Regions:
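Non-catalytic DNA-recognition/assembly elements of restriction-modification systems
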Residues: 1-36, 130-174
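Hydrophobic/aromatic residues in well-formed alpha-helices
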Residues: 6-9, 90, 123, 128
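A positional/architectural concept
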Residues: 8-70
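Hydrophobic residues at beta-strand termini and immediately following loops
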Residues: 29, 78, 126
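Short, charged, solvent-exposed linker or helix-capping segments at domain edges/interfaces
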Residues: 40, 87-91, 137-140
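A short beta-sheet element
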Residues: 55-96
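A short glycine-rich beta-alpha junction/loop motif
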Residues: 69-74, 110-137
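Short, positively charged
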Residues: 86-124
Length: 174
């Protein structure tokens, strides 16, 4: 396992200022696209990299449906060698990893701004531990599956609540 700075293994591309983009609205990468990619609504393919939402400090793999979209300045595209980094492992480390959380907290110390937006320099200076690619795949796939399972459980809880409310209304009407 090696520990490396992100800027040593990832090529970052900052999104464009929205006022300078001439693309159609449907060609822009939106926060909804980000959430859909993270929650596996769209299918992903290896080698497409990841997107970091700089406002939320979250990371998601790029899906086939959003790979050609133009990203705005609230997003950072991450391209890397798929033989070195597995996208879902990187997302797990960025979104849930204790090491990243501690490094980001240290960066935010002394910041008085209410919006603690990350920047490309700070992200590049974060360190990541890179185990062998097979271990990354195992961790990343488990992380992806946990997101899918959580979403299914939330949906099931919503359905149970709707059903219960329907029963209550029927009893109340009698």
């Amino acid at each position: 396992m090696e520990s490396v700075y992100l800027n040593e293994v990832i090529q970052f591309t900052l999104g464009k200022n929205p006022t300078r983009i001439r693309a159609q609205v449907d060609e822009l990468y939106t926060p909804e696209d980000f959430e859909n990619d993270l929650h596996c609504i769209h299918s992903t393919k290896e080698g497409m990299g990841c997107i970091i939402n700089l406002i939320k400090s979250k990371c998601s793999p790029i899906s086939e449906q959003t790979e050609a979209k133009c990203i705005t300045s609230n997003f950072l595209r991450c391209d890397f060698d798929i033989g070195k980094i597995y996208a879902w492992y990187f997302c797990y480390q960025f979104n849930e990893g204790k090491s990243f959380e501690q490094q980001i907290e240290m960066y935010h110390q002394g910041t008085t701004l209410s919006v603690k937006k990350l920047n490309i320099k700070t992200i590049g200076e974060l360190k990541i531990i890179l185990p062998d690619i097979q271990k990354q795949r195992t961790i990343g796939n488990l992380y992806r599956q946990s997101i899918i399972q959580n979403d299914l459980m939330v949906k099931q809880a919503e359905n149970v609540r709707k059903f219960t409310m329907t029963l209550i209304r029927r009893i109340d009407e009698d």
